[in-house]
Amino acid sequence: MFKKIDKNANRVKRHLRIRKNLTGTSEKPRLCVFKSNTNIYAQLIDDVNHNTLVAASTLDKDFSGESKSNKEAAKLVGELIGKKAIDKGIEQCVFDRSGYLYHGKVKELAEGARSAGLKF
């Protein structure tokens, strides 16, 4: 009998494997991505002090896209977090894709953040 593959459980395992080697500091925080079926979220996290420096999502008041779950929305969230980070004086970060493949929405968010001026 075949077992059903749980994609989210596999993603969490990948995320834990990746997180062993990724840490963010206040000078170079970790850009963490989370996507649900309806929204996409991004945070710049300082792992040394355990706090979130900047956050952006499709639920923000500053978000201006019509749809909240497609690639265009992900690119807008990337640009939004990039602008907020530059305003706070953060220019570099470490990209944490949270176990998701670097494809589609995750890739668009990363490109949006790069176009706003973040370097990673």
Swiss-Prot record:
InterPro entries: Ribosomal_uL18_bac-type (IPR004389), Ribosomal_uL18_bac/euk (IPR005484)
A single Gene Ontology CC term: cytosolic large ribosomal subunit
Keywords annotated in UniProt: Ribonucleoprotein, Ribosomal protein, RNA-binding, rRNA-binding
Gene Ontology MF term list: 5S rRNA binding; structural constituent of ribosome
Listed Gene3D superfamilies: 3.30.420.100
Any Gene Ontology biological process: translation
Protein's UniProt name: Large ribosomal subunit protein uL18
Phylogenetic classification of the source organism: Bacteria, Bacillati, Bacillota, Tissierellia, Tissierellales
